[in-house]
Amino acid sequence: MHYLEQWNYCPKCGSKQFVVHDFKSKHCEACGFTYYFNAAAAVIAIIENEKGEMLVARRGEEPAKGTLDFIGGFVDPGEGFEEAVVREIEEETGWRGLTPGPWTPPAPLRGEKWREGSSYSQDGDGEERSNLKVLFSLPNTYLYSGLTIHSCDCFFHVLIPSDAKLKANDDVAACWWEKPENIKVEDFGLHSARIGLQRFLELKKKGKV
């Protein structure tokens, strides 16, 4: 099946002369427009607190409604990955203590206390740094309104205090802290979330996160 099989008309001029150009594109023989079906950019936040608990969410909307997931979503036009993951965390949990910036290790690893009410920490020169870090990326498919969207999901490791006031918003039905040993990969509804969780736990075992 061609990626654009459902697209029968040119999105620029409306002509029916919209034919296959290559495996991921179609070309309009009427106006010359060529459309390429490229992967959409998305972000996923694997969030931990200083106790080592992970923040899990229950999906409130299709696809995979009712299954577990991580906080995340698609990158908006004009955003970078870092800005997108901060926005998604704010939209879906209400937490506004993050700003894109250089990575700082968790406070417990530095022998320091977390600053109350903030996910920031300070390094030796007093510079404030954000506790979010890029982990890896994975391909994913996302069925929405009958159209299969191919995405490239960028995974972040994010640190938020356990006493942060979080409230499920947007398309998240609920979110809560959970011990890693109680989290089952098969309870996650989206493919990249399952694979991402497995990879993250493997990195944890190796001491790489």
Predicted regions and their residues:
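Nudix hydrolase/Nudix homology domain
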Residues: 1-5, 149, 160, 164-209
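Residues immediately within or flanking Cys/His clusters that coordinate Zn2+
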Residues: 7, 25
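Short cysteine-rich clusters marking metal-coordination/redox-active sites
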Residues: 10-13, 28-31
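Short functional micro-motifs and their immediate structural scaffolds
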Residues: 18-19, 36
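Conserved N-terminal beta-strand and adjoining loop/helix that marks the start
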Residues: 30-54, 74
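Conserved Nudix-box catalytic region and its N-terminal flanking loop in Nudix hydrolases
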Residues: 49-91, 95
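Active-site segment of metal-dependent pyrophosphate-handling enzymes
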Residues: 86, 94-105, 127-163
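Glycine-biased, low-complexity coil/linker segments
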Residues: 111-116, 123-125
